[in-house]
């Protein structure tokens, strides 16, 4: 890479934080807001789907989704997300970030609406169409991971880059929060308009016909924030790093950045390509330079998501233990949606959202490595603290302590590896592979999410087949599952050692794209500082 290319990039690295940086955070962050809303809102309505479509006359308890149907409805979006992360990650490097960025939103908008319009003459066909549209919804969501992270990293200055990328990711917390609040509003409105007896009083009447609209409305509203952001995304210029380093047009890169950032960049003639940086993805040279880095980002994200998505194992027990969700038969269908949404909203407000924003505040102060290592460490400690004396926590008088431990575990997931595993892959790989490698890392994480959400759902079943949930085979029990999760977090600490610290360093320094041009880089940096000071 030549000095004239470095000129525009160094100007971005030293540019002061300005309004367009925050605009980019909002534009990219609204995608993640939508992602979180769409992925998490399904958990608010699965109980309702069971009552509506799988009611059994004469049963003591309301209908529930069979294990295979529940796994499909909850997990199919993860499968789509994994595929979308790989495909759009690759496409973002092939065609450019800007060209692909709007596609993901359109897929999300169309499939959010279509999910709420799922149709069929019997439960099987309704669930099939719902799963079909949620797969493609996940496909669009998956594309947002590598593209949003890459775009934000390539726009940001090196001083606050970590906070900017983490802020985009932190919008997930608000998406979860909004999903819960909206479900509370919708269910409260329907309960007021269409009151119904509890299940134990009148099983059939406890689910009013209008309840079928509740889950559809909640799913469809996910299209709104994505649709509102589409125009803004279409107006974002291509990132300077893609234009200069991949498209090899430093002049256009300088022109594009001068339009949106208050930085004076002299448009110089096109530089020559550095042959030492022309190796391909997964080539011998790539593996030599970045092989361990990619192993580090994929393994830590995989291990983190196993633990993070295993929270489904304990939520229902925790909510019931502290009285947030009473037994299902003591509520009607819409009341159950209200109680579940209220519980999830409180968890998001007290644990999830603060953890995200602690990362935003401290990531450029103490660094990515320290936050990730600290997060895995405390997750390990709290998982073992829950597991080893598990029988102690099952006593009613000790359950508040269990809830506190549980909340701290996921606070340190968010003020820890859940955020840093998203940030780091967008910083340490060359520009021409950045989106692809982030997509690979994210897809590895989503594979871990499937293991955590569904593998452990089976694994955590009681070894005594008479005590397993309906339709599930015997497992190893919750205590042993917690021990396994503690070991998973411990492995996360080990693999974090493969991930380099990127705090305060330029993307080109981290990726090695300027290692042959130290002198020209230094010269260009001086020029850039002069340009910025006059801007």
UniProtKB/Swiss-Prot annotation:
GO terms for molecular function: arsenate ion transmembrane transporter activity; phosphate transmembrane transporter activity; symporter activity. Residues 1-24, 92-99, 153-161, 233-289, 367-368, 421-438, 502-535 are cytoplasmic. Mature pollen. SUPFAM superfamilies: MFS general substrate transporter. Residues 46-70, 121-131, 183-211, 311-345, 390-399, 460-480 are extracellular. Residues 506-535 are annotated as: Disordered. It is found in: Membrane. Keywords: Membrane, Phosphate transport, Phosphoprotein, Symport, Transmembrane, Transmembrane helix, Transport. Residues 519-535 have a biased composition (Low complexity). Induction: Slightly induced in roots during phosphate starvation. One of its GO terms (biological process) is phosphate ion transport. It comes from the Eukaryota. Signal peptide: none annotated. The modification Phosphoserine is found at residue 520. Although related to the sugar transporter family, it does not transport sugars. Belongs to the major facilitator superfamily. Phosphate:H(+) symporter (TC 2.A.1.9) family. NCBIfam families: 2A0109 (TIGR00887). High-affinity transporter for external inorganic phosphate. This is Probable inorganic phosphate transporter 1-7. It comes from Arabidopsis thaliana. The lineage of its organism: Eukaryota, Viridiplantae, Streptophyta, Embryophyta, Tracheophyta.
